[in-house]
C-alpha cells in the first residue's frame, strides 16, 4: 500500500511547493537528531525527509497523486516489476526503460543545436581537374536570421521555461497495468522537446533563429581532384536551430568524359592511329596533352599493333604532392582497305623481297610473357 506522504508532512494534496517546504522545515526543526535525540524522533525525522524528497520532485509527486508509490516502484524488483525478477530488464531493453518509477529523464534537447552538413555536386571537365579551378556557385541553405541574429526573439524578449513540461522538454504519463505502474515519456508537444518557449518570437524566422536563403560562395577546387572526390568547406552548410553553428558544405566532383583521354587514377591513356607504312618506317605524331600543350611523340620503326609508349610524368598531377602520373599512348596500326593498282604492285614487290616471312598458326600462350604463358606459370610452376 502506498505511503501517505502528504500526511507525514501534515499538508493536503493541494498544497503548493512552498507549503510543502514550509511544513518540512517546521517538522525538521522539531525532530532533528541534534535537537531531539529520542530514537522515535529520529525515525520520524527520516520519514519526513523521505516524504519531502518525494513531494518536492514533480515526477515522483505525480506518481503519488495517481495513487502510486515511486519508492515502492523503484525498489520492487527493478522498475516496478516486483517478483518477476529480470522481466523489468527485458521490457527496458525493448522499450527504453519507460516502465515503473525508474524511467530516466532525457532532459531537453536544447534550443540551440549544430546545423547539418550540405552536399553540392559539381561537374568538371578533365582540364579543370588537372589545373584546378575556382568557381562561383549558388547554394540554398539555412542561414542566420539577420533580424534577430539567431536569438529567435523579437526585440529584448527572452525564451522562458515551458509551462507544459516545466522546462524538462518531455512529458510523462503514469498508467497502471498487471505488471505494476508504467511510466512513459515523450517529447513535449508545446516546446517540441527544447524545454523553453518564446512568447514573442521574431516575425522573420518565427523563433527558429534561421531562415532559408540562396547565396553565392567561391569554391576552390585543387589540381588533381578526381571523380567522386569531395572538397570540404568548413561552416558553409546549414545553420543550426536557434542560430546554432553551421555545418560543413561538401562539394562532390563529377568528372566528365574527355574526347581523347581516359583517366586511370593519376595516369592518362590515349590511342594514336598510325598507318601501316608509318608503323613500319617510324613517324612523329603530335598530341595535344592536357597540361603540356602540343607534344611530339615518336613512333619508332617497326612498332607493332597494341604497342604502348609511356611518357613519364606527363599525366595528371597528384592531389597531395608535386608529382604527376604518366601518359600512356596506345598505338593502333591501320591497314589500308582500299588499294589501287600501283599500291598492289608495290606490296607484291615487298612480299617478294621478304618471301621468307610466311603466315603461321601459333599457340596463343606460346609467346613468352603472354597472358596464357603467365597463367600457366602461375598454376603449373613451369
Curated annotation (Swiss-Prot):
Binds 2 Zn(2+) ions per monomer. Keywords: Chaperone, Cytoplasm, DNA replication, Metal-binding, Repeat, Stress response, Zinc, Zinc-finger. The keyword Cytoplasm applies. It is found in: Cytoplasm. Its main location: cytoplasm. One of its GO terms (biological process) is response to heat. Was identified as a high-confidence drug target. The J domain is necessary and sufficient to stimulate DnaK ATPase activity. Zinc center 1 plays an important role in the autonomous, DnaK-independent chaperone activity of DnaJ. Zinc center 2 is essential for interaction with DnaK and for DnaJ activity. This is Chaperone protein DnaJ 2. It comes from Mycobacterium tuberculosis (strain ATCC 25618 / H37Rv). The lineage of its organism: Bacteria, Bacillati, Actinomycetota, Actinomycetes, Mycobacteriales.
Amino acid at each position: 500500500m502506498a505511503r501517505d506522504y502528504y500526511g507525514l508532512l501534515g499538508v493536503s494534496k493541494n498544497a503548493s511547493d512552498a507549503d510543502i517546504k514550509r511544513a518540512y522545515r517546521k517538522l525538521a526543526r522539531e525532530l532533528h537528531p541534534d535537537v531531539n535525540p529520542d530514537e522515535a524522533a529520529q525515525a520520524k525525522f527520516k520519514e519526513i525527509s523521505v516524504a519531502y524528497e518525494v513531494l518536492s520532485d514533480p515526477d515522483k509527486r505525480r506518481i503519488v497523486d495517481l495513487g502510486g508509490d515511486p519508492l515502492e516502484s523503484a525498489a520492487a524488483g527493478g522498475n516496478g516489476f516486483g517478483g518477476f525478477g529480470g522481466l523489468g530488464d527485458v521490457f527496458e531493453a525493448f522499450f527504453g526503460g519507460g516502465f515503473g518509477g525508474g524511467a530516466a529523464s532525457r532532459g531537453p534537447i536544447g534550443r540551440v543545436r549544430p546545423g547539418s552538413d550540405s552536399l553540392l555536386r559539381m561537374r568538371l571537365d578533365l582540364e579543370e581537374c588537372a589545373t584546378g579551378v575556382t568557381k562561383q556557385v549558388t547554394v540554398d541553405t539555412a542561414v542566420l536570421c539577420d533580424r534577430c541574429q539567431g536569438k529567435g526573439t523579437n526585440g529584448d524578449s527572452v525564451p522562458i521555461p515551458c509551462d507544459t513540461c516545466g522546462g524538462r522538454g518531455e512529458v510523462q504519463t503514469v498508467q497502471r497495468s498487471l505488471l505494476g505502474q508504467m511510466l512513459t515519456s515523450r517529447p513535449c508537444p508545446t516546446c517540441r522537446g527544447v524545454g523553453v518557449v518564446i512568447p514573442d518570437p521574431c516575425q522573420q524566422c518565427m523563433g527558429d533563429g534561421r531562415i532559408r536563403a540562396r547565396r553565392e560562395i567561391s569554391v576552390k577546387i585543387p589540381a588533381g581532384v578526381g571523380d567522386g572526390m569531395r572538397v570540404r568547406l568548413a561552416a558553409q552548410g546549414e545553420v543550426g536551430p536557434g542560430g546554432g553553428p553551421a555545418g560543413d558544405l561538401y562539394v562532390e566532383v563529377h568528372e566528365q568524359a574527355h574526347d581523347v583521354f581516359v583517366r586511370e587514377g593519376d595516369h592518362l591513356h590515349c590511342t594514336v592511329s598510325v598507318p601501316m607504312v608509318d608503323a613500319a618506317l617510324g613517324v612523329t605524331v603530335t598530341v595535344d596533352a592536357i597540361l603540356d600543350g602540343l607534344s611530339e611523340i615518336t613512333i619508332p620503326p617497326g612498332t607493332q599493333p597494341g604497342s604502348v609508349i609511356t611518357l613519364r610524368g606527363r599525366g595528371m598531377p597528384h592531389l597531395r604532392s608535386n608529382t604527376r602520373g604518366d601518359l600512356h599512348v596506345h598505338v593502333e596500326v591501320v591497314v589500308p582497305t582500299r588499294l589501287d593498282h600501283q599500291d598492289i604492285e608495290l606490296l607484291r614487290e615487298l612480299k617478294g623481297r621478304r618471301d621468307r616471312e610466311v603466315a603461321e598458326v601459333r599457340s596463343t600462350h606460346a609467346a613468352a610473357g603472354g597472358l596464357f604463358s603467365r597463367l600457366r606459370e602461375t598454376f603449373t610452376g613451369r
